A protein has these predicted regions:
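Beta-hairpin "wing" of winged helix-turn-helix
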Residues: 68-78, 85
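Short, Lys/Arg-enriched N-terminal segment that forms or immediately precedes the first helix
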Residues: 5-24
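Residues within the DNA-recognition helix of helix-turn-helix
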Residues: 63
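Conserved segment of winged-helix/HTH DNA-binding domains
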Residues: 16-20, 83-100
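A short acidic, leucine-rich amphipathic alpha-helix
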Residues: 49-51
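Helix-turn-helix DNA-binding motif, specifically the short coil turn and the N-cap/start of the second
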Residues: 56-59
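Short capping segments at the starts of secondary-structure elements
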Residues: 30, 41-45
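Pre-recognition alpha-helix immediately N-terminal to the DNA-recognition helix
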Residues: 22, 33-37, 92
Length: 100
């Protein structure tokens, strides 16, 4: 099925379907899902996420950037540290995902 051909949908619905597809593709990654799960409990810095996930700093940073790009995660700087947490949208989406 070609995700760009929607003969039955309005252009607004086409955009919503495309956005939903992109979001589901993003959160279907096991590492990103694990990060979302960890951030659901509290904010964390990259070094804490590294310990929790056994992923490298560069990979965690890459995943966080992707999650920030879709407004699921935000950051807060405190001195030399950056703390990451779920946005309101991130909390809503994460809660929905973990209800499935």
């Amino acid at each position: 099925m070609n995700m760009n051909s929607y003969s039955c949908c309005s252009s607004n619905k086409k955009k919503n379907v495309t956005d939903l597809f992109a979001l589901l593709k993003l959160v279907s990654d096991n590492s990103r899902l694990k990060i979302l799960c960890i951030l659901q409990k509290d904010e964390h810095c990259v070094c804490e996420l590294m310990k929790e996930t056994n992923l490298s700093q560069s990979l965690i940073s890459h995943h966080l950037r992707d999650l920030k790009d879709v407004n699921l995660v935000s950051d807060r700087k405190e001195g030399n540290w950056v703390h990451y947490s779920l946005t309101d949208e991130g909390k809503r989406i994460t809660n929905l995902l973990f209800q499935i």
